[in-house]
UniProtKB/Swiss-Prot annotation:
The gene is PSMD8. Component of the 19S proteasome regulatory particle complex. The 26S proteasome consists of a 20S core particle (CP) and two 19S regulatory subunits (RP). The regulatory particle is made of a lid composed of 9 subunits including PSMD8, a base containing 6 ATPases and few additional components. Interacts with DDI2. Interacts with TASOR. GO terms for cellular component: cytosol; nucleus; proteasome accessory complex; proteasome regulatory particle, lid subcomplex. The modification Phosphoserine is found at residue 43. There is a cross-link at residue 234 (Glycyl lysine isopeptide (Lys-Gly) (interchain with G-Cter in SUMO2)). Keywords: Isopeptide bond, Phosphoprotein, Proteasome, Ubl conjugation. InterPro entries: 26S_Psome_Rpn12, CSN8_PSD8_EIF3K, PCI_dom. This is 26S proteasome non-ATPase regulatory subunit 8. Residues 99-268 form the PCI domain. It comes from Bos taurus. The keyword NAD does not apply. Belongs to the proteasome subunit S14 family. Component of the 26S proteasome, a multiprotein complex involved in the ATP-dependent degradation of ubiquitinated proteins. This complex plays a key role in the maintenance of protein homeostasis by removing misfolded or damaged proteins, which could impair cellular functions, and by removing proteins whose functions are no longer required. Therefore, the proteasome participates in numerous cellular processes, including cell cycle progression, apoptosis, or DNA damage repair.
Length: 287
């Protein structure tokens, strides 16, 4: 009789727990619909989306919906969690929050790769995986870039527009074809790619500017604008101020104070820098 009572209590507890989980799941689905409604607006309120994402993350943890918990999840649960985190990754880009983007992508890769046999392919999968590749390039994490690339089918690498874009950029960087990298900004597969490609272009500009400072005693304003791939004089002026360049007589930037003294020079760095810039010019003419 005691055993029967215990079993009855256990059964009641189990059914009560299931009912509670069902109620929380229903609440999570409702919160997701609110998030999706705000996110799909022409100009979403990013602060409101962030608050919704924060609440949903707590709910997902409570329901053990995240793939790191080891809980066996249903298809419906997995899709709900994946969809929420896809919005989170895209929201992170608009907020320019790189650590947040990286965290969301770490979770999403579990859904894209570990559960690929159980789930229908997400419409945003290739876009976000391509964004992740571009993120790694922008951070100069080339080894990780190739590790992530190895997880993708050869067909996607060769034909998918979202994956091909960062792959092409990496090839241009390996070749030193910086002009092609700058031209690629006008051919991005999605607006969200702008954030990371701008970071990459800023890094390239800094490298070219460093070469200019070592290779030239002075350079004409218009020449610097062209070499650094600026399309307006104002952008060139703003960049020059950031680097501490001062525009002097006859519209020249002077770098005499940054030149190496002959006796301190152990390698022909000035000549090498000039060759690099001349090579970039020749590539620009070819394109």
């Amino acid at each position: 009789m005691a055993a029967t009572a215990v079993n009855g209590v256990a059964g009641t507890s189990s059914s009560g727990s299931a009912a509670a989980s069902g109620a929380i799941l229903q609440a999570a689905a409702g919160m997701y619909e609110q998030l999706k409604g705000e996110w799909n607006r022409k100009s979403p309120n990013l602060s409101k989306c962030g608050e919704e994402l924060g609440r949903l993350k707590l709910v997902l943890l409570e329901l053990n919906f995240l793939p790191t918990t080891g809980t066996k999840l249903t298809k419906q649960q997995l899709i709900l969690a994946r969809d929420i985190q896809e919005i989170g990754a895209q929201w992170s880009i608009l907020r320019k929050d790189i650590p947040s983007f990286e965290r969301y992508m770490a979770q999403l890769k579990c859904y894209y790769f570990d559960y690929k046999e159980q789930l229908p392919e997400s419409a945003y999968m290739h876009q976000l995986l391509g964004l992740n590749l571009l993120f790694l390039l922008s951070q100069n994490r080339v080894a990780e870039f190739h590790t992530e690339l190895e997880r993708l089918p050869a067909k996607d690498i060769q034909t998918n527009v979202y994956i091909k874009h960062p792959v092409s950029l990496e090839q241009y960087l390996m070749e030193g074809s910086y002009n092609k990298v700058f031209l690629a900004k006008g051919n991005i597969p999605a607006e969200s790619y702008t954030f990371f490609i701008d970071i990459l272009l800023d890094t390239i500009r800094d490298e070219i500017a460093g070469c200019i400072e070592k290779a030239y005693e002075k350079i004409l304003f218009t020449e610097a604008t062209r070499i650094l791939f600026f399309n307006t004089p104002k952008k060139m002026t703003d960049y020059a101020k950031k680097r501490g360049w001062v525009l002097g007589i006859n519209n020249y930037y002077s770098f005499a104070s940054q030149q190496q003294k002959p006796e301190d020079t152990t390698i022909p760095s000035t000549e090498l820098a000039k060759q690099v810039i001349e090579y970039a010019r020749q590539l620009e003419m070819i394109v």
